[in-house]
Amino acid sequence: LAACFVLPVEDDLDSIFKSLHYAAKISKSGSGTGFNFSRLRPKNDVISSVTGFSSGPMSFMKIFDAVTEQIKLGGLRRGAHMGILRVDHPDIGEFVTIKAKEKVLENFNISVAITDKFMNAVQKDKSYNLINPRTQKNVRDESAEKIFDLICETAHKTGDPGVIFLDKINKDNPTPALGILESTDSCGEQPLLPYESANLGSINLSNIIINNKIDFNKLKNTVHKTIHFLDNVIDMCKYPTPETKEIVHANRKIGLGVMGFADLLIKLKIPYNSERAVKTAEKLIAFIRKEADNASVNLTKERLTFPNWDESIYNKK
């Protein structure tokens, strides 16, 4: 029932191929996976154990892609991945442009993990450090504006890469004591810790228009039912790995979104590109967030708090 999962990728073959094995199982079930490859040493970096040199993160991404390509679901559907690399990884230039070539990483969305430090360097037209993840030492300096322009130009031409703002998502991390957020599900809706799943649902906003007005009572009722439903999904879902089952049940994350906003605007005769449309979106999302929180609180009266409550930011409020 879960749409996607996040798997960790550490800088050793056991970790890489363990995640590949899990990814194959997940793809077979029709779900997607998210990976952050930033811990892998850069291309041509030394491998002391075999007196050789690393092939770099992109070579392993191609292996993940090839395995996924072979797992056909009824001959029609394959799994999908999100591949992420930090903007300060030495191989960032190759990563940004890799999908500009045809038939490369066709089963991957890719995104650059961007930091506030990098964006400050872009704004000030300064260089920034590219860091070897194995040694944590500076490999070379690079123009932040050059890399940022490359990201924008390539995204405009090919649709990839996207960007993920690491500092922002970790500012909103509900369980920072359990680890930092550095990956998302395959379409980027939800930042997740290793082995967490994206348990997602959407409310069709087109259905809350009654007599040419937004029916907030209907929306409230829908939000509360959806929160209850998504929490039930956590217990009903079959999980591909023991690690996933453990952390999903411990954190009980869900993702509530919306669809049909353009249809809602049409019914209300509001132009999509208007200030009124922006205000309507802000009002709706604020209402949904408030009622989702209220619904979650109501669930605790029946089901108590989630097991990792003591490790969360909510325990301090």
Residue ranges and their predicted role:
Residues R252-P271:
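Extended amphipathic alpha-helical segments enriched in small hydrophobics
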Residues L1-D12, P133-T154, T158-V163, K283-K317:
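Gly/Pro-rich turn-and-neighbor structural signature
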Residues T97-T158:
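Polar, glycine-rich mid-to-C-terminal structural blocks
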Residues L1-A2, V6-S49, P57-F60, I71, ...:
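Function-dense linear segments that define catalytic or interfacial modules
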Residues T51-A66, G93:
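Glycine- and Gly-Pro-enriched alpha-helical subdomains that act as flexible
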Residues F37-K43, I84-I92, T115, T135-N138, ...:
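A glycine-rich phosphate-binding loop feature that marks nucleotide/adenosyl-phosphate handling sites
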Residues L1, L20, T222-K245, H249, ...:
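Internal maturation/activation junctions in enzymes
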Residues L13, I47, I71-G83, E102-L105, ...:
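Inter-helical turn/loop segments and adjacent helix faces that build the functional surface
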